[in-house]
Amino acid sequence: MKLIKSCILFFAFVILWSCSTEKNKVLNREFHNLHAKYNGFFNANEIIKVTYNDFLKTRKENYNSILPIFPLPSLEQSKNWYAPMDTAYRKCELVIFSHRMPHAKKGKNRNREWCKYIDDNWMTMGKARFYKKYLPNALKIFQYVENHYEIEDNYYESIFWQSKVLIEMGAFDEAEEILLSLIIKFEEQQLEAKDQEKLTVKQKLRLALIYKEIIDYLESKEPVISPNIINKIYPTLADLYIQSKSYKKAIENLEIAVENKYKKAFKTRLFFVLAQLYHLENNFKASLYYQEVVERNPDYEMAFQAKINRALSFSGRDYKAIKSQLLKMLKDDKNIEYFDQIYYALAEISFKNNAEELGK
């Protein structure tokens, strides 16, 4: 029996020793990658996702003001996030402590970190602090990723998230500078990529065969800004400009954003906010975008508000269609509590239409 116990202890010691963070072997890397991905990064992100979705389900939209592009908890509401965000944070913190494998070899393996999910865990810790409204701490974490993982995919993601933190802190000029610089950098990288495509076959063979040139080439490479980050920048810029009341700039960025691909609900939200901004400017495009929202079949309340606002933004176009839509809404029992809004909208379009007729 003692022999069996001794063997078990021996093999346990061998396994633990073989998975040391100091040993850079394939088995070690896979062991630490697996734990860093699922024990920290994946589980922590699931906690954040579930908490955010629960928040959205219980949240009530205020259609009397411009909708926030990215709904976030208020300072008071964020207190309900403390426990889940702390859990997510601790999971990632433990993973970083237990599984990071620092390394500084040059060439194609010149990563500062052999465990490829460590920077992802840092990013998740930053997001947990962001949603908890610990903004200075979140900013420091994203800055840490920028300074220590400059060759990883999360390098530019960390810079982007710094802008989101700065927006919530009210540092609009700093956030704007970051976001615009990312767009400029992306455009520069696109041009460089086109130049790389122009390399001759001889030059490509030279890069492939001469070791020193391979090393020099890899050392000179930098992380690429993904189109996914650029897609997130335009709604974020619009959010910044709305919060700073620069509505014309917000419209410009939303016009770009709605041309990109997003999940249906988020894109519908962008159309609604764009319609609201045009409505503020008494621009006929408001009516067009409210109709776009209706046609995208959103939830009942957003569809209702889009129909009402379309009528209120009426500028002499499609009078009959809008009136018909409002009269149809009066026949729906679900709208009983909103009848006052519908009658008000009918009166508004009738008044505007009569004014149009008199002006002819």
List the model feature ranges, each with a label:
Residues 19-360:
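Acidic, polar-rich low-complexity tracts and alpha-helical solenoid repeat scaffolds
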Residues 7-16:
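Bacterial N-terminal signal peptides
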Residues 1-6:
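Positively charged n-region of N-terminal signal peptides that target proteins for export
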